[in-house]
Amino acid sequence: MICCDKVLSSVQSMPVIDKCSVTKCLQTAKQAVVLALSLFAVFASGSLSILSAAVLFSGTAAVLPYLLILTTALLGCVYAVIVLLRSLSAVVQSCKKRSPEEIEGAARPSDQQESGGRLSEESASPQASPTSSTLRLESAFRSIGDSVSGAFDDINKDNSRSRSRSF
């Protein structure tokens, strides 16, 4: 995703950096950091749970500390996977919000002329089109993100109901 090099011309034909593209860059960088950290958390908590399970089932150590470590690591792994899926869904949704003109504008007209129209023939078939496969992938990630978001909404509603009953 290249978003920081977008330059618009103003009324006087002077190049001006679009402020919207700068915020898109910051959002994309933030999403990339969240993706990297959640992926690291998945690997770290997964390896910790495997190690603690190995020590726990070998029978050479006390059971309770490693049982607590195992449950904490598994819970951390589940939460890290949820965060990873939500951030992937957010990245896919932000990519989908890009207009088709921006995507088509990325292809240079000189490339289409050099290929002799072969590019337009290939893109006409639905199997050769890379956008159809990316749209399927985006819809899959969106449905995963929506289900995870719905699960969080249900949990928050249940928590607010239980708090209101306790007071």
UniProtKB/Swiss-Prot annotation:
Phosphoserine, modified sites: 166
Keyword hit for Secreted: yes
Region (Disordered), start-end ranges: 97-167
Residue ranges of the TM segments: 33-57, 63-88
Site (Interacts with 14-3-3 beta): 166
Designated gene of the protein: incG
Bilayer topology term: Multi-pass membrane protein
Assembly information from the UniProt record: In infected HeLa cells colocalizes with host 14-3-3 protein (YWHAB); phosphorylation of Ser-166 is probably required. Interacts with Pkn1.
Gene Ontology cellular-component terms listed: extracellular region; host cell membrane; pathogen-containing vacuole membrane
Predominant localisation class: secreted
Motif Phosphorylation-dependent binding motif location, chain numbering: 161-166
Chain intervals for the UniProt region annotation (Sufficient for interaction with human 14-3-3 beta protein): 94-167
Protein name, UniProt field: Inclusion membrane protein G
PTM characteristics: Phosphorylated, possibly at more than one position, in infected HeLa cells. Phosphorylated by chlamydial kinase Pnk1.
Compositionally biased spans, kind Low complexity: 122-135
Keyword Electron transport: no
Function noted in UniProt: Inclusion membrane protein probably involved in early modification events of the chlamydial inclusion.
